[in-house]
Amino acid sequence: SDVYKRQAQYNEATWWTQLLITAAGILLTTQLYWKPTLWAKRSMKIYMVFLNGWISIVYYMMYCGARGHHHILAIFWGVIAVLWLWDLFTGYTPFERNPKYKVLVGVLYAMPFLYPLLSWARGMEFPMMTTTVMPCSVAVFTIGLLLAFSRRVNLLVILFLCHWALIAFSKVYIYT
């Protein structure tokens, strides 16, 4: 399908950057666990602004133009980036550890790395496969991050991501 062709173009053009973005996410997440300083918390919020902005601009605006609704998806992810920017300046989400959902958080953190394996199991190879810096991966990582540090979280981010996930889930049945 055209969706997978666009996905392949995105992966071919950005794979090196995706590796750097993923490595930065791993380092910043690790920093939140081991040394949750104010710098680490603000750095994670800056990263989330960048990551969601990347999905909005690079993924949807630059590589998903064939989708008639790509502007809507770009706006949606842009709003999430703005919500993280607002959070950066207000300090609303303090990133305080909550070990209550450890198992679920572990599963959610693993999912961005499982997506390529699941794509491969479906017979897709690079560059057609889902990677760690795509909307599904970013959504599950963000939900995992907010659950892991959920003493107080930005509910708007969660509502937006859950709404997107419910709608996007249907594409599993549409695109084969």
Predicted feature descriptions by range:
Residues 20-35:
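N-terminal signal-anchor/start-transfer transmembrane helix
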Residues 39-49, 98-105, 150-161:
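Membrane-interfacial loop-to-transmembrane alpha-helix junctions, especially the N-terminal start
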Residues 50-58, 108-119, 161-173:
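Aromatic-anchored segments of alpha-helical transmembrane domains
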